[in-house]
Amino acid sequence: MSQKTQLLVEGAVVIALATVLSFIRIIKMPWGGSVTLLSMLPIVIYSIKNGVKNGLLVAFVYSLVQFGQGVIDGLFGWGLTPGSLIACILIDYIIAFTVLGLAGLFREKGLSGWIIGTVLAIVLRLFMHFLSGVVIWKSFGELWGGFATENTVLYSLLYNGAYMVPEIIF
């Protein structure tokens, strides 16, 4: 099997595995996001094994799959304006999941590089969800007694950190 074919097959397998794991939700947040059974791990390992370029490509495809899952979960039922919806798709799905491909950034540095790259990629994903919470989803904080409208940054950090920090740890 040629190297390109092997990369393609491995990429398809890790996307499928990550998708299956993303459906195993340990904690599901009320307005999106969840703690899953290591769903980012296959993408991260692929990036570390095959490099950032290939990792970003596979992570981008995974982001499209996650967007599809978001549609199934009711993304279009949240009443977003067209502009907010486009921003949500870009920030919460395309960019947030594509950055997982950066896990292989320090792969040549051995185990410490793998850990640093993985944490960096997941923290960047957390940052994208945090940014989305501040810019797009701030009005949903009113469901918490107005907390978010007064403290949008803190609300977004707490909400998104509640599911992303466990994902970093596991």
Language model features with spans:
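Loop-helix junctions at membrane interfaces
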Residues: M1-F170
